[in-house]
Amino acid sequence: MASISSPDGSYTLTAPAQALPLTRHLSYRLTPLIYRLPLTPNQVTALSMLAGLAGAWCFALGTANWGIAGGALLVVCYTLDNCDGEIARLKDMSSEWGAQFDDLVDWMIDSAFFAGLGYGTWDSTGEILWFWCGIAAAAGATIDYVIDLIHHAKSKNQPEAKTREEEATDVRKPEDFKDWLIYIFHKLSRADFCVIVLGLALFDVTWVLLPLGAIGAQAYWITDLFQRARGWHT
């Protein structure tokens, strides 16, 4: 694949050097196609949002076939979520508002997915506990989003604070065992979560994500309270 660079040569789309996240391998092949279209990064983010919300709606229907469709739509959503940043850098259209919009969409999709999955599982089994597990996971995602907003608001006026663009392009590498645990947790629960969802949907067992999400979402926002957990490019 021929390399693509930004007009000033400051950014070049390169092949992923690591196995994870898997969606990065998909976006690496999709971004050159989107680059040729008259789409802005924010429009790509909006497409990602539509795909993700449609996926959440599919899970709310509570059937196996709709679950597979929902999982596929989530893969599209997460892939486009990678593409928007790559398009922003290639077209030199990165902006603080675009980063904030991207964060907002991430929260919307996470919350909608768990709420939809919880409702769909409740509807198909008659057990309302599944619904409350979904709500707990969505609440955890909401708390994490609020923590991120507070973090960025506090660091905004600090001279040494990084911009959203610098945070996105400054790839942090794990240095010790604790770093690797946090790194893998963030990768699997964030960047490649859609692949896990699709895999489980193929066997009609996405319900297992509800208790895991109800607990894991709380663990995610708790780790985000600490500086050590921040900076992973997922």
Indicate residue ranges for each PLM-predicted region.
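Short amphipathic alpha-helical coupling elements at transmembrane boundaries
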Residues: 28, 32-36, 85, 89-92, ...
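Membrane-embedded alpha-helical segments that form the functional core of polytopic membrane enzymes
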Residues: 41-97, 114, 133
